[in-house]
From Swiss-Prot:
GO CC entries: chromatin; cytoplasm; nucleus; Pi Mi complex
Keywords, alphabetical: Cytoplasm, Nucleus
Major location category of this protein: cytoplasm
Gene name of the encoded protein: mat1-Mi
Tree of life domain: Eukaryota
Protein's name according to its UniProt entry: Mating-type M-specific polypeptide Mi
Amino acid sequence: MSAEDLFTIQILCDQIELKLASIVINSNIKLQLKRKKKTQQL
């Protein structure tokens, strides 16, 4: 394992974390929108 390999792995891990974070944020927003629609219907 060279330093370049470790650096590449670090970048990939960061990208995966960002993708996971954006997925979580998007799903949270969708849940909030669904709740708003339900409360508006009542």
